[in-house]
């Protein structure tokens, strides 16, 4: 069975995502504007077996014009089951 996938908007340091990971979901992208929250999130995701999160953690303002295109690049056409 394939894992359900999700994108985390306003991700913070990944607390809500962590619950989804524990339930077996797979993240495709996280969007967060705060640098230190992104750094924490990158470290936490390594704990869950993600080898390199430099691209999947988008450190940017979600209201910027290039945010949605950047999410599309990271998702790479994969199906998104949930947006949190």
Regions found by a protein language model. Give the residues of each.
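Conserved active-site and SAM-binding loop architecture
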Residues: 1-84
């Amino acid at each position: 069975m394939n894992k359900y996938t999700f994108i985390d908007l306003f991700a913070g340091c990944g607390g809500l995502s962590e619950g989804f990971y524990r339930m077996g979901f797979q993240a495709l992208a996280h969007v967060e504007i705060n640098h230190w929250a992104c750094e924490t999130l990158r470290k936490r995701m390594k704990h869950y077996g993600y080898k390199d999160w430099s691209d999947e953690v988008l450190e940017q303002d979600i209201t910027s014009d290039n945010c949605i295109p950047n999410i599309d690049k990271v998702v790479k056409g994969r199906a998104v089951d949930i947006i949190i």
